[in-house]
Amino acid sequence: MLKFTEEHEWLQIEGSVATVGITNYAVDQLGDLVFVELPEVGATFSKNGNAATVESVKAASDVYCPLDGEITEVNPAIVADPSLVNSDPQGAGWFFKLKLANPADADGLLDEAAYKELTA
């Protein structure tokens, strides 16, 4: 199940685990990324907690945790090569995997149609 936030994160949810990244729209707004800082595996976050940071040639921006949960995995490839986020933000450029505290909370996030409307 693919969901989105108003802060331009995407979540691919499988069971109780969500893979999280930033959307094409966010990447377009930021420009070329030059730095990515990811959370520690095992860290817990509340919804909208500051989970990661990205820096581009234009600006620095926070990446928020879309739901309550625990980080189970991070993507070291984007730390080594932030351009992966630019080239494939909703694929190889994922940020972290989050074990959701309450998977039903995802129902309150945006679906693809609602997100497209938000960014139109």
UniProtKB/Swiss-Prot annotation:
One of its GO terms (biological process) is glycine decarboxylation via glycine cleavage system. This is Glycine cleavage system H protein. Keywords: Lipoyl. HAMAP family: GcvH (MF_00272). The keyword Secreted does not apply. InterPro entries: 2-oxoA_DH_lipoyl-BS, Biotin_lipoyl, GCV_H, GCV_H/Fam206, GCV_H_sub, Single_hybrid_motif. The modification N6-lipoyllysine is found at K58. Belongs to the GcvH family. It comes from the Bacteria. Its cofactor is (R)-lipoate. The gene is gcvH. It comes from Rhizobium leguminosarum bv. trifolii (strain WSM2304). The glycine cleavage system catalyzes the degradation of glycine. The H protein shuttles the methylamine group of glycine from the P protein to the T protein. The glycine cleavage system is composed of four proteins: P, T, L and H.
